[in-house]
Curated annotation (Swiss-Prot):
Organism: Chlorobium luteolum (strain DSM 273 / BCRC 81028 / 2530)
GO biological process: light-independent bacteriochlorophyll biosynthetic process; photosynthesis, dark reaction
Residue sites binding substrate per the record: G428, L429
Protein name: Light-independent protochlorophyllide reductase subunit B
EC number annotated for this UniProt entry: 1.3.7.7
Phylogenetic lineage: Bacteria, Pseudomonadati, Chlorobiota, Chlorobiia, Chlorobiales
Catalytic activity entry: chlorophyllide a + oxidized 2[4Fe-4S]-[ferredoxin] + 2 ADP + 2 phosphate = protochlorophyllide a + reduced 2[4Fe-4S]-[ferredoxin] + 2 ATP + 2 H2O
Gene name of this polypeptide: bchB
Sequence positions that bind [4Fe-4S] cluster: D36
Compositional bias ranges of the Low complexity kind: 460-470
Length: 525
C-alpha cells in the first residue's frame, strides 16, 4: 500500500535514468509493461533542458508472454537505428524480474554489437533510486576508465552531479568558480554532460571531488584504488566547510603536484572568491551577528533529508546561524550510521530514520519547530501546520529546478541558504499584520462562517479566521477565538494546542478569555 502514498526515493529505474539521462550518447532501454515509461514525463516537467529524455521502453505484453516471445531484441535494433547511441543500458523491471527473463541472452539476439550494450541487472525489488544510480555510475567507470598520463596542469574530476540533482547547474557553477579562483581546471564532470570518451579520461585527473555520499563516492573510491587518483569527499556547504574544503583540495593537489614537479598552489586572498573580487566571499559571518539574526538563537529547527544534506544543514544552522536543533533524520537507512557519527553532539535525541513521511509529519506537529528544512513532502506537511519550511534536498518539485543562479554549495551557496532561512522564518509578518489589523480599512471581504461552537458568524470585515480546533478538540468562546487571532499565524496552532492542554489539566471544559490569559501566564507568554 506504500505506493499509494509519497515515497522519498524513486524506483531503481529512476536512479538509472538519472545517470543515463545526464550523459551524452547513452540511452536507456527499459524492459517493462506499458505505462512504466512515466519517468519521461518527470524529466520533461522538471528538467530545464531542451533535450528529450534518452529513454525507450521495451513493452512486456500478455500476448507476447503467451507466445513465448520478447520485444526487447527488436526494441534494441530500433534504438540503434534511430538514436545511434554509443551505449544502450538495458534496465530490468519488477515484471521482468518475476518472469526471470535472461536479459543478457535477449540482448545478444538483437544483432547490436555487444560493446554497445550494457545490461544493468539490478534487483528492482530491493534496490531504490540512489543505490541504483551510484551502482550504475560505478559500473560505467569500471567499464570505461583507462590508464593514461596525468594532465600537465592540475585538474579535478567532479563526480555525482546527475540529472534532476538539487540545484544541479548552480552548484556546479559555484564549484567551478572556486576551482577557477585556485587556478584549477575541471577534467571531467560525470555523469552530468559526460560521454564515453570522458569516462575514459577520468584517471588523468590529479584529484576526484565527490561531495555527495549518495552518488559518486563509490566510483571515486574505485578510481583511487585502481588508478591512484585521490579523492576529496567533503561537502562545501556553509562558510567554514567551504574553507576546510578549499584547504583540503589544495593540500591533496599539492601532494600530487610534488610528484609531478609542479608549482604548489597557494590559497588566494578570500576576496578573490567573491563575485566582485573585492569584498568578503560571503555575508553570512557578519549577517549572523546582526540584531535580526541573533534572535535566531532562540529559534528551533528540524532537518530531514538525504544523508549529505541532513548532516551539512544541521551543522550550518547550528554552527553558523546559531539555531537550536531539536531533531534531525534521514530516509536513507544505509547511510544512517554515517549520519549519526557526523552529528554526534548536535542532536538532543536519537536520529530519526524512516521512509514514512507520515512519521516525519507527526514529529513536526508534536514539536512545532520555527523552521523545517526538508523535502517536498515536508513542504506539504508544514503547509497544513502553518510551519515555515524550506526544501533543501530531493524529492523536489518544479519550484526547486530553477533557471536562475541559486547554489547551495560554496560561499555563494551559504548566502543563498542564509537568505532562505531568514525569509522562511520571517516572512509571514505581512499576513500576521493583516490578521491583526484586518478591519482597518482593507477593501476585501471573506464569506461569513459559523464558529466552531455554533454561535454567530464572523463579521465580513474580519480577516483570516483563527485556526479551527482539531477533531475532538476543546470548544472556545468567541472572545477567546478573537484573542487567538491576534497571535501570529505561524505559531497559532502551537498556542491553541498548549492552551487546550492547560485547560484540560486544570479541569476546564472550554477555553474562555480568562482561561486563555491564565494559560499564557503559566507558559511564560
Amino acid at each position: 500500500m506504500r505506493l499509494a502514498f509519497w515515497l522519498y526515493e524513486g524506483t531503481a529505474l529512476h536512479g538509472i535514468s538519472r545517470v543515463t539521462n545526464s550523459m551524452k550518447g547513452v540511452h536507456t532501454v527499459y524492459h517493462a509493461p506499458q505505462g512504466d515509461d512515466y519517468i519521461t514525463a518527470t524529466y520533461t516537467m522538471l528538467e530545464r533542458t531542451p533535450e528529450f529524455p534518452a529513454l525507450s521502453i521495451s513493452v512486456v505484453r500478455g500476448r507476447d508472454l503467451a507466445q513465448g516471445v520478447s520485444r526487447l531484441p527488436a526494441t534494441l535494433q530500433q534504438v540503434e537505428e534511430h538514436y545511434h547511441p554509443e551505449l544502450s543500458v538495458i534496465a530490468p523491471s519488477c515484471s521482468t524480474a518475476l518472469l526471470q527473463e535472461d536479459l543478457h541472452q535477449l540482448a545478444a539476439q538483437s544483432g547490436v554489437p555487444q560493446d554497445k550494450l550494457m545490461v544493468y541487472a539490478v534487483n528492482p525489488f530491493r534496490v531504490t533510486e540512489n543505490e541504483a544510480a551510484d551502482g550504475l555510475l560505478t559500473a560505467l567507470v569500471k567499464r570505461y576508465a583507462a590508464e593514461g598520463p596525468k594532465t600537465a596542469a592540475p585538474t579535478v574530476n567532479l563526480l555525482g552531479f546527475t540529472s534532476l540533482g538539487f540545484h544541479l547547474k548552480a552548484n556546479l557553477t559555484s564549484i567551478r568558480r572556486l576551482l577557477t579562483t585556485l587556478g584549477v581546471k575541471v577534467n571531467v564532470v560525470a555523469p552530468w554532460g559526460a560521454g564515453i570518451a570522458d569516462l575514459k579520461r577520468l584517471p588523468e585527473a590529479w584529484l576526484t571531488i565527490a561531495p555527495f555520499r549518495e552518488i559518486g563516492q563509490t566510483a571515486a573510491a574505485y578510481l583511487e584504488e585502481t588508478f591512484g587518483v585521490p579523492t576529496e569527499y567533503g561537502t562545501p556547504l556553509g562558510v567554514e566547510p567551504t574553507l576546510r574544503w578549499l584547504r583540503a583540495v589544495i593540500e591533496k593537489l599539492n601532494t600530487v603536484g610534488a610528484k609531478e614537479g609542479a608549482t604548489p598552489i597557494a590559497m588566494p586572498e578570500l576576496h578573490a572568491f567573491s563575485l566582485d573580487g573585492m569584498s568578503a566571499p560571503s555575508g553570512v559571518p557578519w549577517f549572523a551577528r546582526t540584531a535580526d539574526m541573533e534572535s535566531f538563537s532562540n529559534k528551533k529547527a528540524f532537518v530531514f533529508g538525504d544523508a549529505t544534506t541532513t548532516v551539512a544543514m544541521v551543522k550550518f544552522l547550528r554552527d553558523e546561524l546559531g539555531m537550536q536543533i531539536i531533531g534531525a533524520g534521514t530516509y536513507l537507512e544505509r547511510h544512517a550510521d554515517w549520519v549519526r557519527k557526523e552529528l554526534d553532539g548536535y542532536l538532543p535525541g536519537a536520529l530519526m530514520v524512516t521512509e514514512r513521511f507520515q512519521d516525519v509529519a507527526q514529529v513536526i506537529e508534536d514539536e512545532m519547530p520555527d523552521l523545517v528544512c526538508g523535502t517536498q513532502m515536508e513542504r506539504h506537511s508544514c503547509r497544513k501546520l502553518d510551519v515555515p519550511c524550506m526544501v533543501v534536498c530531493p524529492p523536489t518539485h518544479i519550484e526547486n529546478h530553477l533557471l536562475g543562479y541559486y547554489p547551495f554549495l560554496g560561499f555563494d551557496g551559504a548566502d543563498v541558504i542564509a537568505d532562505r532561512v531568514y525569509i522562511s522564518c520571517k516572512l509571514g509578518l505581512e499576513k500576521h499584520l493583516i490578521d491583526f489589523f484586518g478591519d482597518a480599512g482593507l477593501e476585501y471581504e471573506e464569506p461569513s462562517a459559523s464558529s466552531e461552537n455554533g454561535s454567530a458568524p464572523l463579521s465580513a470585515g474580519t480577516a483570516t479566521p483563527a485556526a479551527a480546533p482539531e477533531e475532538g478538540g476543546m470548544a472556545w468562546t468567541d472572545e477567546a477565538e478573537t484573542m487567538l487571532k491576534k497571535v501570529p499565524f505561524f505559531v497559532r496552532k502551537k498556542v491553541r494546542k498548549n492552551t487546550e492542554n492547560f485547560a484540560e489539566e486544570n479541569g476546564e471544559s472550554r477555553v474562555s478569555v480568562e482561561v486563555f490569559r491564565r494559560a499564557k501566564e503559566s507558559l511564560g507568554g
